Amino acid sequence: WLVTGYPWYGIQTPEHQAFLKAYQERFKDYPRQGSIIGYSAIMSLAAGIKKAQSTDTEKLITAFSGLTLSSPVGPITYRAQDHQSTMGSYVGRTKNEGGKGVMVDFRYMDGAKFLPTDAQVQQWRAKD
């Protein structure tokens, strides 16, 4: 089966390995997809506050326009036009290994490649 998910056991980037080690030391368990999404969301907020030097809503909106930060799955950018995150997803196949379902033959699909273009967003907004 073709699936999306979070193959924590097979991501070998230094950023992910650091996240995985810290997570397992703290929680004595492996991270789930919600773990990586939550971590990336909090790191995004921290980067936005640091850039804005404030928690004021308008300053954060400005700070998030084009904000790029590192994450365990690679860089994430918040598009200037609509503040959509480019965080992607892992896509692969399922396989039974030792009685457990695992994701194999996976690759990271950068969300930036799948978001609507700026022109499309402008067109949709014009209809609202």
Positions of the model-derived regions?
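Extracytosolic ligand-binding ectodomains
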Residues: 1-128
